[in-house]
Amino acid sequence: MKQAFKTVRRNRGAAGVDKISIDIFEANLQENLDALMRDLKTGRFRPKPLRRVHIPKGPRSKKTRPLGIPVVRDRVAQEILRRLLNPIFEPLFHDASKGFRPGRNCHQALEMAIEIHRLGYRYVLDADIMGFFDHLPHSVIMKAVARHVADGKVLDLIQRFLTAGVMEDGVFKPTTGGTPQGGVASPLLANIVLNHLDWQLDGAGYRFVRYADDFVVLCRTHQEAQEAHEFVQRVLEEDLELQLSPEKTHITTYGKGYEFLGFKLSSRSCRMRAKSEQKFKDKIRSLTVRKHNLDAKAVEKLNQVIRGTANYFATSFATVRWRFQKLDSWIRMRLRCMKRKRKNYNDNRKLRARYFRVKLGVLTLEEFCVGTGTHGNAHRVIPRNGATLTGVAR
């Protein structure tokens, strides 16, 4: 139970409806954990409603994504549940499922897609499940779990989490379907449900890669891709009571390229997609407002964004150096204007790149690229303390 709390603490997160933060919960940790354990053992545990918040899908987007924030106590209980279920289901998952699993990540999903393309699979069914986390029926979740879990207390606990409801603007709303984005156990439950689709695709002979509810089916011909579309639609509708989004699901080719996990993949390159680059720029803009001071705290926040972006996109299979150079130049322009407190200052070019890197300690995206390969750049990871750790992200 203490290990479960450590995981919750490491992931941080805001307080739930009870307004008890992680720090407040930790102040009486043993007492809180003992009470939670008693309630779980006796069956008296009742999850509190989630605090519903809506976050923008992007800085320039008017659309929002609903998140459900559990109270800290419930997060610990969900983490215990996740640790209990994971050893049962992990051996059952398909190898092409790369999301939210031990030892699996986005880069492995992208590498698998690239390797399949190299085998001659040039057509892509780029699939999107309509409102997956919001519309996933509770009955489908419970049926998928119950196939391998017979303990009534565990099943009852899952059911209680699913039906805990949400508080939005002070009003309670029951939850009759879906699993909340933001819930600790939600990614595992998603994998448990979609594992059925994985093995159905495998049994039909299709090659695919899935990361949570984001997946692509890779085919040799356009006709095969059309058949895959019909097959996926049928499995989702008949077995899982879900649907593909007609607007977001389409067939394309590796030559034309497609977007997957923040990248634009094509036969020519693997690079940041335009939306990912725009999100990065929007974050930098918010940190380089001219009226703000370019002090050590500002540099630290800036470096966090640069480091996170570089560590994700500067991989051994991605072509990013040329784009990173342009983005670094754009960042320096923002910093010069910030330093001079005005836009297009005539002599702000006098503040050279070396000034920002050496004197102020601002990282550059390009310095994470230390070598080039067939598809792009190996990279080094620069930890928060500034030490350099060399490695290849494979």
Question: Model segments located where?
Answer:
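A conserved non-catalytic segment of reverse transcriptases
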Residues: T163, D239-K301, R307-T309
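Phosphate/adenylate-binding "loop-and-lid" substructures adjacent to NTP/NAD/dNTP-binding pockets
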Residues: F5, K19-K57, T64
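Conserved polymerase palm-domain catalytic core
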Residues: D39-H54, L92-G257
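Right-hand nucleic-acid polymerase module
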Residues: R285-R349
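Short acidic (Asp/Glu) and glycine-rich catalytic loops that position anionic groups and cofactors
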Residues: N11-D18, P59-S61, F89-F93, R122-Y123, ...
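Hydrophobic alpha-helical hairpins/lids featuring a short glycine-rich hinge
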Residues: L67-L84, P91
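Extended C-terminal regions of large enzymes
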Residues: W330-I331, K339-R394
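Charged boundary/loop elements
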Residues: M1-I22, R83-A96
